[in-house]
């Protein structure tokens, strides 16, 4: 087994592949955070003991 200098340890992805995965992970985190923010706002608005 030879070492591929284009691969990043320990994932075995290339730098471009790792950057693409990271970009999608950040996007997913932002979408999840936005949905959570909306859900928390709706829960706060709908519960009488908080308002």
Swiss-Prot record:
Q: Which UniProt keywords apply?
A: Antenna complex, Bacteriochlorophyll, Cell inner membrane, Cell membrane, Chlorophyll, Chromophore, Light-harvesting polypeptide, Magnesium, Membrane, Metal-binding, Transmembrane, Transmembrane helix
Cellular component terms per the entry's GO annotation: plasma membrane; plasma membrane light-harvesting complex
Please list the residue ranges that the record places on the Cytoplasmic side of the membrane.
Answer: 2-23
Topological domains, Periplasmic: 47-51
| Residues noted as binding a bacteriochlorophyll in the record, renumbered to the chain | 22, 40
Q: Which family does it belong to?
A: Belongs to the antenna complex beta subunit family.
Q: What is this protein called?
A: Light-harvesting protein B-800/850 beta chain
| Species per Swiss-Prot/TrEMBL record | Cereibacter sphaeroides
Q: Which lineage?
A: Bacteria, Pseudomonadati, Pseudomonadota, Alphaproteobacteria, Rhodobacterales
**Gene name per UniProt:** pucB
């Amino acid at each position: 087994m030879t070492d591929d200098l284009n691969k990043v340890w320990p994932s075995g992805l290339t730098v471009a592949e790792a950057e693409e995965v990271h970009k999608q992970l950040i996007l997913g985190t932002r979408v999840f955070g936005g949905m959570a923010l909306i859900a928390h706002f709706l829960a706060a608005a709908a519960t009488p003991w908080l308002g």
